[in-house]
UniProtKB/Swiss-Prot annotation:
GO terms for biological process: division septum assembly; FtsZ-dependent cytokinesis. Homodimer. Interacts with FtsZ. The keyword Cell division applies. This is Cell division protein SepF.
Length: 196
């Protein structure tokens, strides 16, 4: 009997350990995504530092003779070029934003309703369109204006009657202040034109 009791106790010993062993595996699986996400920023930092080091020899700046002792510098002095890079990135991004602010205005004079699709594509691509309906009949022009109003509405843009049969369609990122237009035109004595 002693042997049988010993075997049962031995079996119970391993069964209890198996149940306890299965519980810690769940938190280990949950912690894996956090471990995988932390190395990514380190890789990006290395790329930025490598990118900066590859650009540094290309820069030619006059250096005083007191700076020729570069090997004697401590590790803390190497962090100073990083703000220069940040400043360079800011100036590049400012130049890109200035280039992005330059926009073109396409001028279209459709002769049929089918020609309006081209104007809609231009507005969809983020440019302004000035549409003159002088070569189109009244019924087709109204139908075209209804279509253009729908296009501009879906793109969160704007459509304005500039004068008579001329309409300006603008995408969402461009706004036109009609009050400024009116003051400019009034100052130049263009009272005879229909401006709404």
């Amino acid at each position: 009997m002693a042997f049988k009791d010993w075997m049962n106790n031995l079996r119970d010993y391993f069964v209890e350990d198996d149940e306890e062993f299965n519980e810690p595996t769940r938190p280990v699986q949950e912690s894996r995504p956090t471990v995988a996400s932390t190395p990514k920023p380190k890789v990006e930092e290395r790329k930025v530092q490598a990118d900066y080091q590859s650009r540094r020899p290309a820069q030619t700046t006059p250096k005083p003779q007191t700076q020729t002792a570069a090997p004697k510098r401590s590790a803390s002095t190497f962090s100073k070029p990083m703000p220069e890079k940040i400043v360079q990135q800011q100036t590049v991004s400012q130049a890109q934003s200035l280039a992005a602010t330059v926009s073109t205005i396409a001028i279209k004079e459709p002769r049929a309703y089918a020609d309006i699709m081209e104007s809609a594509r231009i507005v969809k691509n983020g440019e302004c369109v000035l549409v003159n309906f002088k070569f189109m009949g009244d019924a087709q022009a109204r139908r075209s204006i209804d279509f253009m109003t729908g296009v501009v509405f879906t793109l969160d843009g704007d459509i304005q009657n500039v004068g008579g049969q001329i309409f300006l369609m603008t995408p969402a990122n461009i706004t036109v202040d009609a009050a400024k237009e009116m003051s400019i035109l009034a100052g130049q004595n263009f009272e005879s034109y229909d401006i709404y």
